């Protein structure tokens, strides 16, 4: 009886901590950061645009007039871009603009595998669209997320308010700090993709990833053609400090060569804002200073994007 009582107590404490964790500021901010839908997505007949993408797109798109839906999740691979788009295809009318937003490392990555990175899809997608679906992972991800929280589980006990990154409006730091932030980002990419540098590194070991993602991109093109959607390839803005970390030769080999020919062959509009003058030296447009747009930055970017879509005949109706 004593053992049973202790076991019941442990279970009760676990359930309580899990409940508190799911309702903590940390967990709610995580949900918002991922852009995980907390309720059914509202698809109105006024929707003109749907965007895909990962973290950079998560902070680039905000539809101030409710004329679009963001399917960007943080983080997200091209595989799940397509899974989400196909999953919601019945809600997306013909002539909708579909923006495929390409972060720098997109084509060097096949997929994310850790539960921390894919848990969001267990809330949103049917199991046949989740790679290596597991009922156990579903139970952990949806019912008991405290089990993969690690040290962050402390927020189930100490529920301290944390500001959401989504609401950040500007970044006020020194030039030296901005360069350090850019370097830290690049160090992560070098480690993740096994690159010696970002100027002339050998990328032959990444060819299987490049080929895998090119096939997915062709699938995306075919899907948009079949549905009558207007596909657009977009490269997001980066601050000068970030752009200085790369050579153009490296980016052509590692990045642009994976989609430029597909765009040309299929007559897909390509809009590149990476070197846009507006974003080079106004770090208040990025909440992290270099590549994740702030609230102000989103307004500037969305205005530019919508006007460019209008000029190219993609945006129907009055000029934005």
Language model region names:
Residues 1-9:
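N-terminal Sec-pathway targeting helices
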Residues 12-88:
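Membrane/wall-proximal cationic-aromatic binding patches
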Residues 56-137:
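Membrane-embedded segments
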Residues 106-113, 242-244, 280-283:
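Extracytoplasmic/secreted cell-surface and envelope-processing proteins
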Residues 115-227, 317-320:
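Secreted/periplasmic serine-hydrolase-like ester/acetyl group-modifying domain
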Residues 221-247:
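Active-site segments of SGNH/GDSL-like serine hydrolases
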Residues 240-273:
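Substrate-gating cap/lid alpha-helix
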Residues 286-320:
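Histidine-centered active-site loop/cap adjacent to the catalytic His
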